[in-house]
Amino acid sequence: MNDSGEDFRVRPGRIRGKSGGKPKSFINQVLKAAKKAGHSSSHSGGGKRPSGLGRSTFGRGRIAFSRNRLFSSSRRVVVKARIARHQGRAFRSAPMSAHLSYLKREGVTHDGEKACMFEARNDRADDLAFADRGQHDRHHFRFIVSPEDAGEMTDLKAFTRDLARQMEADLGTGLDWVAVDHWNTDNPHIHLLVRGVDQSGKDLVISRDYISHGLRSRAEELVSIELGHKPERDVRSALERDVDAERWTRLDVEIRIAADETGYINLRPVSPGAGDADSRHLMIGRLQKLERMGLAAPAGPGEWMVGLEAERSLRDLGLRGDIIKTMHRAFTEQGHDRGIGDYVIETGTAASPIIGRLVDKGLHDELTGEAYAVIDGTDGRAHHVRFRGVDAFEHSPPVGGIVEVRHFGSTDDRQPTLVLAGRSDIDLAAQVTAPGATWLDHRLVEREPMPLSMGGFGQEVRDAISARAAHLAEEGLGRRQGQRVILQRDLLDTLRRRELDAVGTKLSAETGLPYKGAAIGEHVAGTYRQRLTLTSGRFAMIDNGLGFQLVPWSPPLEKQLGRHVSGIAKGGGGIEWSLGRKRELGL
């Protein structure tokens, strides 16, 4: 299929060198080049096949794939690996402690509880001590081991320990490692973290070949020992499913091996027989699917040209499919109905701000630590946004809260740093009757109304704004004028002050300390006791020994918990903090 979506056919005949005309598709350009190089069985006008054409001598040009490889009865295991450096130019990972914390999150175990790391001799490993031991290492290794039939295995922990012992034997050194098994995906898998030092304390260097092939082979041997060989009918069934899959498959790997550097593949049988008939049948079926996808084209009887961009396109399609499944599952679990046509997979270059309800967040790539968030946008679309790491969520609200994706970096930065900023910890429904100054109240009083869609979350916000205005009128904070509600002046300050006074009175009764508000220009000083999540935002409790104040919280304060802090109350409710020698403006 070409760029216009219409089917095309390669017609035998002489290639004409006319200039101008319509632009040719990538496949047609490759076919033209291949014909010149002799990779085509197309006949010339006289009916005789020119010598050299269709008789490729490339070693990988003919049916070079092996039935043994495709129909292997060994249990398959996917192993992904990454070397995470702790410093230097290649340092891109979140701290090991943060990575460990996320691996232990709730919802990844059999019962949905918080996971627990294990080690060689203990089912409850001290992962914090493991991170502490490795903080001065040059690097560590992250492995994801995913047996295809993990659900049938008796004990993934025992399997992991056997695999780690085999690694130690292969590498000739003891290993310091921790691991955790995850059951939150279609196929259970193990995260294995190995310190980057050997038993003598020297840097541990593992050959790329062992990481790429050796470890996987060892894992497959262990699974095959436990479960036995895979029945041929199961192998065949899996390959038949691969024929029509819109992702990178084992069949595509074999096609890549069999093709030459131009993408030409010859599937004409050298010696027809049962030995390769099944493999060839599957390959042809797969190539026909690639043709329908616009990624391959027939070049003659039993001959094909595969677009050089096919692998990347298939991998991108597979990734897109995984993202769509993640988004659909997230919206379904939260009880929201959003059509796939409204899904947007962001690339980090969105022209307009992404603001909306947080539907889900997690690890996009558990190996690299890349994170993602699913946002039900005020523009009526469902956004999937990727972040460099889970540290982008450090101060984000819980699922259901209101968020905004913020960009940090220059305007021409191709990969700006993205942070998920909280706009409200309170979900939309609760804001309608909440006591403080809500995110909805800010929408009611802003001079330039936020653009809101007529469907999806945008419409939900429209309805919630109307309901909030009606509630404020009932509370005496506005009056009706026909179909409109005229709100009182200083609405936000009034609502914020009411909530702080109510919370301050409650805390005063609990602590026995008097509550005192902070006036503009007033010096605020004392011990930072706790953070409070209120309708009006996040506030810090500052105890000066004689009483306490509730002032706007800001991220730099969190590291000062239990310590003495000081600052000056600014207009608009912010505090300009003096933390050591650095002054921070808390808004």
What is each of the regions a protein language model found here?
Residues M1-P188, L193-L587:
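N-terminal nicking endonuclease/strand-transfer module with a His-rich metal-binding environment
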